[in-house]
Amino acid sequence: HFANSIKQYRPLYIGETFSVTCKLGNLIAHDKGQAFEVLSYVAVDGKRIWEDTSIYLYKGKEGIGSVLEWEQLVLQENCIKESWSLYQNLGFEFALASGDFNPIHLHPLTAKVFGFERHIIHGMWGAGKILALLEKRVPQAFEFTVLFKTPIYLPASVIFRHEKTEEGFNFDVVDHTQEKPHLKGYLKVLENS
């Protein structure tokens, strides 16, 4: 799983009946293998209110298909910076909240079995934290896109950087030296939704 893009046209309200549709999307070229999309849609009374594109990578020889245009996103030097301290047990706490008990997020020993130096925080934890911080600053119709670059090993000190744009915000999370990107993306207002 290396990217997510969510378009919310309006919130889903408590008590609403909704339908969910999922399907496979496009192939995407990647230098480490073949990437592909999984598309999900939420509708209320037949009207789409939310859509998600999740992009997954099958490692192997270089893939075929289109290339992600937003991989080249670069923030300005004067962007806003905020330090985050991620503690040892954060992966386990996220598992309790999300129901995702993947061993690579729980403990250093279980992560090593799957080839990681130590356990890592779930990329969706970072995406969720960023969305929670920024979504209050845009209308209810928005697009939130995030690209997961490198794992964040726990415990860690990272820097969340963001900047206002004409359309919304660009953001990233980098290591404490600000040289190694962990994730990056944008939040933009959807017009005429």
Question: What kind of region is each of these model predictions?
Answer:
Residues L109-I159, E163-T165, V173-H176:
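Catalytic-pocket segment enriched in acidic/His residues
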Residues N4-S5, C22-L24, H30, S66-V67, ...:
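Mixed-charge, polar/low-complexity N-terminal
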Residues Q8, S40, L57-K59, F94-G99, ...:
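Broad hydrophobic/π-residue packing in well-ordered secondary structure
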Residues Y56-I121, E135:
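Catalytic strand-loop segment that frames the active site of acyl-thioester-processing enzymes
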